[in-house]
Amino acid sequence: MKQLLFIAILSVFSFISSAQTSISCKSRETCWWNVDSEQFDICSDAVFDNSMFVMNENEDMLVHKTSDMTSTYYVTSSESEEDYITYEVVSDVGNEYTVFFDVQNMLVKFMGTDDEGDIYLTMYAIKSVF
């Protein structure tokens, strides 16, 4: 039931949003790109991590709030598919990310690169959408 509600909310919010959408998350896991296997398969253990993502009604700004910081991301482009919504974003400090709302797996995913150029994927498990 929760997944159906989540799908309905994300579908509506990606096309005809009339209010901000909030997504609370319960855990976080980071995986690194393995050049040999060509997969994100070098992963940390999932850790308990309460955080919230808030997309404004125009879908041009995403805010991520944790217990110790708030980051703002400005949307530069977006694409919608049946089970995915993808945003290209730039953070308030100039870092570029690809953000995926993975409807089927109930995940928010941030893909970026570290200072050495290594690609990582941080996945947040969704607790609630409102």
Kindly give the residue locations of the regions a language model identified:
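Hydrophobic/aromatic beta-strand elements that line small-molecule binding cavities or substrate pockets
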Residues: 49-55, 75-77, 96-101, 123-127
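N-terminal secretory signal peptides
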Residues: 20-67
